[in-house]
Amino acid sequence: MAVGKNKRLSKGKKGLKKRAQDPFSRKDEYLVKAPSTFATRDVGKTIVNRTVGLKNANDSLKGRIFEVSLADLQNDQAHSFRKIKLRVDEVQGKNCLTNFHGMDFTSDKLRSLVRKWQSLIEANVTVKTTDDYLVRLFAIAFTKRRSFQVKKTTYARSSQIRAIRKKMVEIIQREASTRTLTQLTKLVPEVIGREIEKATRGIYPLQNVHIRKVKLLKQPKFDIGALLALHGESSTDDKGQKVEREFKEQVLESV
């Protein structure tokens, strides 16, 4: 006799199904907070499994990386092609406190910059900020026609490209090595690109000069005090806003 399972005997009642449990019933929502250097602090919400036994929800949240458009963070659509990466470093209550983790361009913006009849110049610099963050900055630039030029093409010579790249490296090193990571994130969108464009005008005129990518290579030992200061926990909450205050001279009372 064959030994096996008798399918006829093991059948249960028809029509009964196992009750499906909602997976979101075991999860909690946390708010993602951007540093106070940005105009908009509330990035969005993230979900995580509730703390059960030795599995802590805070440990699951720490280290998460969120990609946000700079246009949403600064309320300015001119920065819509820049993507900012934010990393969760600390969880306080239902708030995830983040720090800058990198910057990148959208692929459609990069593709729109590359055109015919011009030279593409790229440079990358690894630099250490004053607060011991090791970052690598990638710069991109394109040649443009001179005001009196008749020729259609704007190809730069190899010697000119080398001279422009040298200037790009010098400016990026000077601007990045003398500032903190927070100050660097403010300079990256426009300031460094304009400085490069101005400095290389005598070699060959450039256009569309950008820091297209910022990569975080190494960070210092975690300091909760520095993170709280970055989020304005120990100071006023007007960081990230435009400074539009009038200067008023203090009048000292006579003693």
From Swiss-Prot:
Major site of localization recorded for this protein: cytoplasm
Segments of skewed composition (Basic residues): 1-18
Cystine pairs: none
GO cellular component, one term: cytosolic small ribosomal subunit
Region span, Disordered: 1-22
Molecular function GO labels: structural constituent of ribosome
Cellular compartment(s): Cytoplasm
PROSITE patterns for this protein: RIBOSOMAL_S3AE
Family indicated by similarity: Belongs to the eukaryotic ribosomal protein eS1 family.
SUBUNIT field: Component of the small ribosomal subunit. Mature ribosomes consist of a small (40S) and a large (60S) subunit. The 40S subunit contains about 33 different proteins and 1 molecule of RNA (18S). The 60S subunit contains about 49 different proteins and 3 molecules of RNA (25S, 5.8S and 5S).
Protein name: Small ribosomal subunit protein eS1
Species this chain originates from: Uncinocarpus reesii (strain UAMH 1704)
Gene symbol of the encoding locus: RPS1
